[in-house]
Design a protein with these regions (language model features):
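Acidic/glycine-rich phosphate/pyrophosphate-binding loops and surrounding catalytic core
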Residues: 2-215, 220, 229-237, 243, ...
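Active-site glycine- and acidic-residue-rich loops that bind
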Residues: 141-143, 248-251
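Glycine-rich beta-strand-to-loop/alpha-helix junction loops that act as flexible
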Residues: 223-224, 244-250, 268-270
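Active-site loop ensemble at the mouth of alpha/beta enzyme cores that anchors a bound cofactor
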Residues: 281-285
Length: 285
């Protein structure tokens, strides 16, 4: 995962680009009917139960739009919320509140949905050693927020992008001429370029597991699209040589049994690509 400083930089970029996209040369609806001296107050209202996420993001958005806006936070990121709860109040320039409204809601609704789903998955893993991981199957331009939401929901972050970890998947292996060649070429490249990156290698069957184990320097083996029986066999083969990760269509119905196979991690793209926004609204008071 990237550093906290890099993550903050990504979030700032998301905010700047989203405001550019949404506001453009001006919010003419507000400019047309609301005086620039008008002051107002609004509440962020919960309309669906779940795990709230994006409160810190909302504060950043309000500050970016207008540093004079005052935000009173009543409920923090990661808390369980129910219908009727008020997460925060924002007060100040009415025009500024309206300018920030859509980005705040878009971000918080999406982040809260992801945090809620992640939390449900973590509950299913209780009593096992497995931890839930996200993937790169994120909304383009929104990745930092979605990965933050996974953490808020109790999950762990996989690599952020293509540059903070090496992950040799099926196509890399096939293009490189096989597992052993792909691993050796990767280790040579990292040594020659002075890059200190962990290496994950995907295995499609037990034979590939055995071949991966012949090479040193692999941080984690991705056990991809294995059934339960073969996953257990893979975990036994790997032992303490490196960490293990199950992936491939794992959902609420199957995650517990995969965890009980003894893997260290389970990665699921569904955390970020198959969620429905949590219903939130910003209402004038």
């Amino acid at each position: 995962m990237i550093s906290e400083a890099k993550l903050n930089e990504e979030v700032e970029g998301i905010i700047a680009n989203a405001i550019r996209e949404d506001v453009g040369p001006g919010d003419y609806s507000s400019l047309a009917c609301i005086p620039d001296t008008a002051q107002g107050k609004a509440k962020l209202l919960v309309k669906e139960k779940g795990i709230i996420a994006g409160v810190a993001f909302a504060q950043k958005v309000f500050a970016y739009v207008d540093e004079a806006l005052e935000v009173e936070v009543l409920i923090q990121d990661g808390a369980e919320v129910k219908v009727g709860d008020i997460v925060l109040y924002v007060s100040g320039s009415s025009q500024s509140i309206l300018k920030a409204e859509r980005l705040v809601l878009n971000g918080m609704q999406r982040m809260s949905a992801i945090a809620t789903k992640t939390n449900a998955y973590t509950q299913l893993l209780q009593g096992t050693k497995a931890k839930i991981l996200d993937t790169r199957k994120t909304t383009p331009g929104f990745r930092a927020l979605e990965k933050m939401a996974v953490k808020i929901g109790g999950g762990e972050n996989h690599r952020f992008a293509l540059y903070d970890m090496v992950m040799l998947k099926d196509n890399h292996i096939d293009f490189a001429g096989g597992i052993t060649k792909a691993i050796e070429k990767t280790k040579n490249y990292l040594k020659e370029t002075g890059r200190d990156l962990k290496i994950i290698v995907e295995a499609r069957d037990l034979g590939e597991i055995k071949e991966i184990l012949l090479s040193e320097g692999v941080y984690r083996i991705l056990i991809d699209n294995f059934n339960y029986e073969d996953t257990r066999k893979a975990v036994q083969l790997i032992g303490d040589t490196c960490l293990t990760e199950s992936s491939g269509g794992i959902n609420e119905k199957t995650i517990r049994e995969y965890a009980e196979c003894g893997v260290d991690f389970i990665s699921s793209g569904a955390l970020t690509h198959s969620v429905y926004n949590l219903d939130l609204s910003l209402k004038a008071v």
